[in-house]
Every structure is written in C-alpha cells, then in structure tokens.
C-alpha cells in the first residue's frame, strides 16, 4: 500500500510537468505550418513569355515536330557515314565432310563441297570496305535537304504554337474581365429591380416595370453564370496546354490592354521575305526533289566497291603453319574490286526517274503557291492587325460611354424622366460594349501573333 501511494504521488507530480514541457510543441508546429500552407496556396503568376516557355516543353505537336527534325538530322548523318569507308572484323570456322577416309584435316584433302577449301577452314580477317556509288552521293544530298525541310517545319510548328498560346493566354485574361463585367451587370440588374420595387410601393411606376426589371435581373444572372463557365473552360484549356500535370493554381498577368506598337509594313515585308519558314520549307523541298531526280538517274551509272582483307584464312587457327618441317605464315592480305554495270531491268530505272520528276514538278508548284500566299498573307494579316489596333480606341470609348449612359439613365428613371425600356437598353448596351472591348483587345494580340508566323518576331508590351 505504501508503494502504491508513493507511486501515485510520483506520477501526480511528474506528469503535469511533462505535459507543460511538451504541450507547446503542437502550437509551434501549427505556427510553422501556416507559412508553408500560405506559400503552397499562392497562385503561380504567369507572363506570356512564361507560358510560351512552358508550352514549348509540354506541347505534344511541337515536340513531335522537333523529334522529326532530330530524326532527319540523324538520317543525314547516316547517309554521310555511308559514303565513308567501313571497317569490320570477320571471324568464322568452316567444317566440311572429307571426300575420303582422312583422319585429319590437311591442305589438299578433297572435300564433299567443292566451294570449300579444306575439311577445317578458319577465317579471321579485318575488312576495309568502300563503295563508290553516284546514287549514294545523291541520297546524301537528298536527305540533307529533307533535314532542312524538317527544320523549317519545326519552326512552323513553333510559330503556330505562339499563336495558340497567345490566343489561350489573352482569351483567359479576357474571360476573367468578362466575369467581372458580368458581376457588375448582375449587380446593376439586382439594384434596378429593387429600385422598381421601391418606386412601385410609392405608386410612382406600374407593376409592369417591376416585371421587366425582374426579367432583366434574371437574364443578367444567367449571363454571369455563362461568363463563369466560359472562364473555367478557358482556364482549363490553357492549363492543359502549358502544364505537364493537371494544375489550376495559377493566374495570368493583367496586360491585355497594355499598349503594344504595330511594326511598319516595310519591316514586316523585309522580315517575312527573309525568315518565312513556309517559303524556306518549300525551297528545301524543291532541292530535295532535284536530288531525288539525280539519284534516280544514278541507276544508269555503274557502281564500284573495293574491299581490302588482312588476316588468316587457313586450316589451323594460328598465325603460322608447319608443313614438311617448314614454317609458313598464315597472315596475308588481299584486295577485291567489283564493278557493277547496269544493263537491263525492264524499265525500273526509267520508272523511278519518272516518279522523281513528278515529285519535283509538284514541289515547284507548291513553291510558287507558297510565294503567292506569302505576298497575300503579308497584306491580309497586316491589315487585320492594323484594323484591330485602330478599333481599340473606339471600343474603349464606347465601353466608357455605355457605362456613363447606364448611370445617367438609371438616375433619370429614379427621377421619373426615363422609361424602364431605356434602362434595360442601357444595361444591354453596357454588356455588349464591355464584351466587344475585351474581344477587340484579344483580336489585336492574336493578330500580332499571326504576324509573327511570317516574321518570327512577336511584338509584346
């Protein structure tokens, strides 16, 4: 009993002190977790350049174009290597049945297969091989031109990706602005509905005004929901485009309405004529087809192969052979030259030449079309960008006037100087003008991105 009492007193004294020492730990841990949670919750702020860098890393189509360009470069390297001498080391052992009862393999013993030299034959030789072929040279030039085509096609994909990212980036910024405008319109619709109710209770307006105001309020609420849905769609589409994993904790910089200068038409024409990837790809395709015709015609020419061998080809796997008490070296060398002269192949070479000429003619047509299209696109895309820029000031002014008109018409309605239809019309006009202002800004940015598909330079704020 005394032991139990002493134990009770001990734990009664010790446990509270232990609890006092350990209890502050969770509080400090919670305090240390708060900054981490706050940092984790902070959205990632993206500029247009950030979005472009991420999209280049994660775009499947763009990476596929880069992969094709890399494959084409390797094919060009392989074609060049095929023009150089190659070295191999051949090792083989041939065992052939003898023609008679011979116990051991010896030089001169007849064998069943006359193509073989002895019962036992060991070959261990280094072989230097070189093929001198006009078709191989033409093939190297052809695949080099094909690599240039793939390179410019990758550049086309890169510039097209800029258009896609720009459209998604500023489309998201525009959708966010439209949500704010829709909230403002919903607030104005709700406020006007309350105004009509108050005026109806005072006997100043008819109940028809209240009904019309309620219809307008509900329409503005539906418009807000649609704007929020459009913002969600734009946000998710943009996230899929630029992030390797699903990520929605980000925001874009608010520079949709920042002033961006338009380059002059002369600058666009000069850069487009020098750096247009479509035109460069078409030119490289014509070069590829020209080399294809030359390669097909190379089928009429003879080809030469040279082989140099050094090593052993003996009945024993050794560098020396002893015969009749004399020692002979098995090491030796030989050179083989083969000249292949084409004579007759039932017109296959002529058919390949015809195919290559058809491809070349089509490539020339596509080059001519690319040149005409470039001239037309320079004028068309520049006119689009210039028109969008010129409309910016007017759209901004229209949005400001629509907002001011809404305030004045609502005030006049409260004073009994305007009708409910005028207020509804002012609200609709403000919604349309605000949306047109956002769409006009996106249109100008996308027009600049389309211009960079010709020039390779994206104009930014």
Question: What is the predicted function of each stretch?
Answer:
Residues 1-11:
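Bacterial N-terminal signal peptides that target proteins for export
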Residues 52-56, 110-111, 205, 209, ...:
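Amphipathic alpha-helical coiled-coil scaffold segments and their short linker/junction regions
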Residues 64-79, 157, 161-180, 191-193, ...:
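Amphipathic alpha-helical coiled-coil segments
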Residues 21-92, 98, 144, 252-287, ...:
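Bacterial Sec-pathway N-terminal export signals of envelope proteins
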Residues 35-44, 90-132, 251-265, 294, ...:
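Small/polar, glycine/serine/threonine/aspartate-rich low-complexity segments that form flexible
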Residues 76, 85, 131-136, 292-295, ...:
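Outer-membrane beta-barrel proteins
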Residues 160-273, 384, 388, 429-430, ...:
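Periplasmic alpha-helical coiled-coil/stalk elements that build and connect Gram-negative outer-membrane
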Residues 9-11, 15-23, 28, 40, ...:
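Acidic, low-complexity, intrinsically disordered peripheral segments
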């Amino acid at each position: 009993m005394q032991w139990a009492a002493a134990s009770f007193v001990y734990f009664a004294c010790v446990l509270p002190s232990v609890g006092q020492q350990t209890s502050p730990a969770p509080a400090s841990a919670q305090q240390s977790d708060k900054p981490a949670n706050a940092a984790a919750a902070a959205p990632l702020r993206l500029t247009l350049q950030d979005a472009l860098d991420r999209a280049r890393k994660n775009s499947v189509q763009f990476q596929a174009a880069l992969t094709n360009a890399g494959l084409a470069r390797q094919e060009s390297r392989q074609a060049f290597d095929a023009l150089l001498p190659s070295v191999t080391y051949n090792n083989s052992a041939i065992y052939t049945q003898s023609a008679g009862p011979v116990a051991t393999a010896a030089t001169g013993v007849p064998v069943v297969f006359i193509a073989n030299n002895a019962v036992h034959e060991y070959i261990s030789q280094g072989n230097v091989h070189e093929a001198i072929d006009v078709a191989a040279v033409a093939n190297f030039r052809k695949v080099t031109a094909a690599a240039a085509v793939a390179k410019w096609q990758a550049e086309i994909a890169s510039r097209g990706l800029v258009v896609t990212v720009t459209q998604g980036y500023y489309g998201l910024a525009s959708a966010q602005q439209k949500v704010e405008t829709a909230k403002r319109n919903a607030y104005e619709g709700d406020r006007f509905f309350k105004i009509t109710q108050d005026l109806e209770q005072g006997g100043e307006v008819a109940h028809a005004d209240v009904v019309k105001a309620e219809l307008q309020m509900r329409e503005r609420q539906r418009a807000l929901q649609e704007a929020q849905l459009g913002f969600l769609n734009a946000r998710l589409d943009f996230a899929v485009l630029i992030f390797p994993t699903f990520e929605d904790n980000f925001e874009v910089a608010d520079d949709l309405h920042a002033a961006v200068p338009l380059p002059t038409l002369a600058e666009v024409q000069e850069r487009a004529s020098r750096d247009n990837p479509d035109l460069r790809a078409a030119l490289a395709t014509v070069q590829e087809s020209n080399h294809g015709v030359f390669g097909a015609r190379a089928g009429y020419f003879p080809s030469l192969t040279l082989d140099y061998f050094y090593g052993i080809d003996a009945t024993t796997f050794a560098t020396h052979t002893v015969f009749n008490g004399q020692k002979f070296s098995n090491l030796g060398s030989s050179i083989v030259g083969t000249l292949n002269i084409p004579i007759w192949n039932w017109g296959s070479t002529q058919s390949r030449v015809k195919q290559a000429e058809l491809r070349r003619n089509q490539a020339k047509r596509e080059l001519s079309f690319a040149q005409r299209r470039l001239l037309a696109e320079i004028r068309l895309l520049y006119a689009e960008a210039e028109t969008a820029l010129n409309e910016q000031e007017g759209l901004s002014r229209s949005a400001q006037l629509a907002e001011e008109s809404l305030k004045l018409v609502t005030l006049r309605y409260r004073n009994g100087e305007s009708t409910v239809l005028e207020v509804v019309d002012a609200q609709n006009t403000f919604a349309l003008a605000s949306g047109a202002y956002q769409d006009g800004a996106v249109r100008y940015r996308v027009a600049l991105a389309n211009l960079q598909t010709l020039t390779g330079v994206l104009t930014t704020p």
